[in-house]
Structure formats: C-alpha cells, structure tokens
Amino acid sequence: MKITYYGHSALLVETEQAKVIIDPFLSGNPNSGISPDDITVDAVLLTHGHSDHLGDAVQIAKQNDCPIFAVFELAEYCRMKGAKVKHMNIGGKHIYDAITVKYTQAFHSSSIQEGDVWIYAGQPAGILLTIEGKTLFHAGDTALFSDLRLIGERTAIDLAALPIGDMLTMGPDDALLAARWLQADKVIPLHYNTFPDIAQDAMDFCDRLRQEGIEGFPLKAGESIEI
C-alpha cells in the first residue's frame, strides 16, 4: 500500500487493486501541489463536510465516474451535486470491489456553507480503510476520545493518520496519546500548517512518537510512504 500526502488531511492510497483519495482538499489548498484534474481513483472517501475536507470530492468523483463514500447527509449532498455516492454511517462497513470501508466516531462538527446558509452534513467520522490486507485509519478531524483505544484493540492498524493542528482538532499531546491507544506503529500527522492558527512542528511530533517506539512520517505534499 502506497500513501501519498497532498497537504492538510488529503491522502491518496494506492495498491495494485485500487486507488482511493481521502478528503481531497486540493484546489483551495496552497500546500497540495496537485490539481484535482490530475487525480485518477476508484473511490473518494470523506470524513466530514467542512470545505477543507469536502474540497474537490464532487469534481473528482464525476471525472472518474466513481462513488463518494460519506455519512448519509453528506452523501446526499454530494448526490444532489451529481456525484455517485455510497451512503455510510458511524459503525457501518461496506465492501466495494477490493476496498473495505468502515466508519468510526470522531468528535468534531460537520457542515457546508453555501452563501449565507450553513447546511448540516451529518456526523463527522474517522475511516478504517482496508485494501489487500493493509489497514489505514484516517481519524478525520477529531478531539481525543477514549474509544480510540477500543478501535485500536479491535483492529490491527498498519498506519494511523492523525490531526495535530490543535485549536480545531486535537493537538500534538493528545495525538501522541491517540497513537498509543490505536496501537499503530506508524503515524502520519495531518491537519497542520495550512493556516497560521494550526501551525505545528511535525518533526518534533514525530520525534516524540519515536520515543514511544512509533515511527512518524512528517510528509511534505507529494511525498509518499509504502507499508
């Protein structure tokens, strides 16, 4: 499994059998380094409806004739915008060709702004993505919560992607504890340095992970790892 980071919380996951993008905030993200026009995937996965996660999902799904996986209300919004969708909800699992997707809790909010109107986009979520026997946990935007320990106990996670930006999500201290609870030996930090209010030192965070026996990957946009 190859995982490429495109800034903020966007990850492209590739195996021989499938390609998936999660939270494709690309065209509006100064740190993405890629255009949504260049994305070729079999599915789009969304953690919640905020613009820095919904991003270019509808465009990417339409140009690839592939579905968007999202919590029910957000999936319906994407469907009304013309995309194919898979309606998910917290705790549910779906197998789609070579991809297995399970939605978990996240403690955050989820909405979409259109003009002066805010649209409810269902509950925020984390995502367990399994392809070819490898499992990635994308925590989405979340605070630290104790059931992360349960997720780690019930699922063999090969790689966890965790927000560290603070202010809008958990910060580095809480993310370090989340990594321990998830029992993942590899972690990618997400959701930092896109805006001044979420500036963090990812190298320092990964150094702290290393002291816990966890390998951290402070990827720059366009950089990849393989697991």
Question: What are the language-model segments listed below?
Answer:
Residues 1-19, 26-29, 95, 102-104, ...:
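Zn-dependent metallo-beta-lactamase
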Residues 8-10, 91, 122-126:
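Short hydrophobic/aromatic beta-strand or adjacent loop that forms the aromatic wall/cage
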Residues 12-50, 55-59, 109-119, 142-154:
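Pre-active-site segment of Zn-dependent metallo-hydrolases
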Residues 21-24, 41-49, 69-72, 137-142, ...:
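Active-site neighborhood of phospho(di)ester-bond hydrolases with catalytic His/Asp-centered motifs
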Residues 29, 50-55, 75-78, 92-95, ...:
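Active-site environment of divalent metal-dependent phosphoester hydrolases
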Residues 32-110:
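Active-site HxH/HxHxD metal-binding segment of metal-dependent hydrolases
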Residues 67, 79-92, 176, 180-227:
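Binuclear metal-ion centers of metallo-dependent hydrolases, dominated by the metallo-beta-lactamase
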Residues 113-180:
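Active-site-proximal loop/helix segments of hydrolase catalytic cores
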